[in-house]
């Protein structure tokens, strides 16, 4: 599920979702 952004600390998030805190 792509909600929009997720934790940049999570490697899985960066590979499946957008990184939050830009």
Swiss-Prot record:
Record GO terms (molecular function): sodium channel regulator activity; toxin activity
Recorded consequence of changing residue 13 to A: Structure similar to wild-type toxin, even with this disulfide bond deletion
Any one cellular-component term (Gene Ontology): extracellular region
Prosequence residues removed at maturation: 1-2
Entry comment describing in which tissues the protein is expressed: Expressed by the venom duct.
Site (Pharmacophore key residue, the side chain functions like a cork in the bottleneck, with the positively charged amine group preventing the penetration of sodium): 11
Cellular compartments annotated: Secreted
Major location (coarse): secreted
Cysteine disulfide partners in this protein: 5-13, 5-19, 5-20, 6-13, 6-19, 8-19, 8-20
Region (Pharmacophore key residues): 14-16, 18-19
Impact noted for substituting residue 12 to R: 40-fold decrease in ability to block Nav1.4. Block of Nav1.2 is completely reversible
Positions bearing the site annotation: Pharmacophore key residue: 7, 12
Mutagenesis / variant outcome for changing residue 12 to Q: 70-fold decrease in ability to block Nav1.4. Block of Nav1.2 is completely reversible
Keywords from the UniProt entry: Amidation, Cleavage on pair of basic residues, Disulfide bond, Ion channel impairing toxin, Neurotoxin, Secreted, Toxin, Voltage-gated sodium channel impairing toxin
Domain of life of the organism encoding this protein: Eukaryota
Residue(s) carrying Cysteine amide: 20
Its job: Mu-conotoxin KIIIA-P1: mu-conotoxins block voltage-gated sodium channels (Nav). This toxin potently blocks Nav1.2/SCN2A (IC(50)5-124 nM), Nav1.4/SCN4A (IC(50)=20-90 nM), and Nav1.7/SCN9A (IC(50)=290-413 nM). It moderately blocks Nav1.1/SCN1A, and mNav1.6/SCN8A. It also shows a very low activity on Nav1.3/SCN3A. This toxin binds a microsite within the pore different from the tetrodotoxin binding site 1 (tested on Nav1.2). The block is partial, with a residual current that can be completely blocked by TTX.
Family under the similarity heading: Belongs to the conotoxin M superfamily.
Misc remark: Negative results: has no effect on hNav1.5/SCN5A. Has no effect on hNav1.8/SCN10A.
Comment on protein domains: The cysteine framework is III (CC-C-C-CC).
Protein name as annotated: Mu-conotoxin KIIIB
């Amino acid at each position: 599920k792509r909600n929009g952004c997720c934790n940049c600390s999570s490697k899985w998030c960066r590979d499946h979702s957008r990184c939050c805190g830009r």
